[in-house]
Amino acid sequence: MARTEGDSWDLANSVGATATMVAAARAAATRRSRPIIADPFAEPLVRAVGLDLFTRAASGEVDLDEVAAGLGFVRMVDTFAARALFFDKFFADAIAAGLRQVVIVASGLDARPYRLPWPTGMRVYEIDQPEVIEFKTTTLARLGASPTADHHPVGIDLRDDWPSALRAAGFDAARPTAWLAEGVRIGFLPPEAETRLLDNVIELSAVGSRLAADYGTINGSSAESQQLAQQMTEGWRAHGLDMDIAGLTYPGEHTDVAAYLRSHGWKTATADHGDLVLAAGLAELTAADRQSPASTIGFVTAVRSTD
């Protein structure tokens, strides 16, 4: 089913199920003998959502890479582990630069407010659908987990007036901020909402602020991309999952985040899927690996150096 303006979802279906899939991949990566990331909260969060395949993948009963490769997504666990590490390093660099305010947009099952070693005085805001925020904070509280920063969850849809909700939660636009938009700028918002999101981030960012994001679309317009999307949709459906890959994304021209930020005076650095995998110390992507949907996604880190 195609996405519509104002549609809704939860962590067991549609866009929400992709967040659960990514968390299952982080859990699988954490279980490896030589893990590049450690996310002890990924498995219990996935288990609480209750999608059988991802629960078994998170616990090690099922090889998620094997399942995903059969659907056309090779090296899924490496992909999301390397992505998580890339963004973890972004926060480490922001901390080293003296930033003490963070905003994570569309946080999903991201547990960074709980798992990263934030310095004293760090304020971490995270924004997502109210039901997602409530589910995650309640589940982690039941596990006895506590945030490692001054944590401010903000439950609101990114298509709504989230800047006002963020300010109401205590966000200070006069302080440099480290912004993270992980897994949201890949077609899950309408093109106009993507641009509006960037405009809002720019407006709320003091000099010295930083942003990290991935961007592109997991569902291209080419016949090959459409065929792969259909293959993945049918494969996930065979596993009892509601993830219509073509229907998850909005059509239209999506914003090149790096170019947009540069046009507004931000200094940017870009990377691709292969760069992240190599930086993580993992095996280089083969030609076959580069046929994965992940290879269509770009990555950017940016710094606001002037008003």
From Swiss-Prot:
One of its GO terms (molecular function) is methyltransferase activity. GO terms for biological process: methylation. Keywords: Methyltransferase, S-adenosyl-L-methionine, Transferase. Exhibits S-adenosyl-L-methionine-dependent methyltransferase activity. InterPro entries: Ppm1/Ppm2/Tcmp, SAM-dependent_MTases_sf, SAM_mthyl_Trfase_ML2640-like. It comes from the Bacteria. This is Putative S-adenosyl-L-methionine-dependent methyltransferase MUL_4430. S-adenosyl-L-methionine binds at residues 128, 157-158. Pfam families: LCM (PF04072). The keyword Methyltransferase applies. Its EC number is 2.1.1.-. Belongs to the UPF0677 family.
